[in-house]
């Protein structure tokens, strides 16, 4: 079996597992990457991310070109046809190769009898492409988002919702964080230029650099030595608002995969940091990040709602709560989020966030700082959440971020800027 032929069927299987089984692409893709040659890994990733980014359009096309959906054991073929559409619409794969390889993918998934059907649908699309795309441009599916999310964005951002959706449908820029314990940002930018690459500093976040062109991490000067970390600019705002100091006791709650834990330690290398996350598997990445950067923190598995279970009676000078959320601010990085989330999830997440906030607030010392952060753009998880918390928590005061009526700072995703992110800085009276 040819590796290239197998590639399309692997992409179809990955997308099927996300859409039909609710699995995260970050869990599904790595084992499939192991099945292809190194030279094909980037294309497999591109096909998976691309199909999930444009799923609404590809589904719309299938409904137009097929009289009945593929179901049961033939369901993977449904997604294989989507992979074919995506290649024809969005990649540089020559059309004849895209057709041939996609049709051959039917053999890999043990549906060789459907090769003719796949070929026919893809060729019909080629013949009718212009007409179909003109019709699609006026359909509800053109936003490439589920309807419930479009409605929420329209309600929350009456004048900005289309800009948010457009940003979500773009490829994200690659942001890095320079480790200030090794280099100044300007110094590392010089090393980057020496390596033949160009980067741009962020105006607000002092360690953030955007690469002109995304690059593999092994090509970045000093990555293995811990000089630089891949982290979106907006995520770097957490440590900026937290402003950790040496010698302080700091809690990083919901810490995995450890990007913010290590940023705290870069800013305050002598801080005593406890990193806690409920997901034991993801905690392994916290250890990996600490090891690569040569840093030490206490790492524990635990549920943020029950601090006594993982820190006893310990109190903290600063707490970073990067709360579990809908992740609607990072859709451009994780397009599977659009299809993994459901409308009902938002109220459940808001309830969980409130429970964690109420549980950890008593662990903050008087005069201490808590930064509440999410990678969401939805008010229920952000401004509304903090407004309600301030109303029920008399010893909490807002600092630097917004006003009591409009608490927090909401970053929206866009262009070369950072992801969608929310921060509220709270001081204990």
Swiss-Prot record:
GO terms for biological process: regulation of DNA-templated transcription; rRNA base methylation. It is found in: Cytoplasm. GO terms for molecular function: RNA binding; rRNA (cytosine-C5-)-methyltransferase activity. The active site is at residue 375. Its EC number is 2.1.1.176. Residues 397-419 are annotated as: Disordered. One of its GO terms (cellular component) is cytosol. Specifically methylates the cytosine at position 967 (m5C967) of 16S rRNA. This is Ribosomal RNA small subunit methyltransferase B. It comes from Salmonella agona (strain SL483). The gene is rsmB.
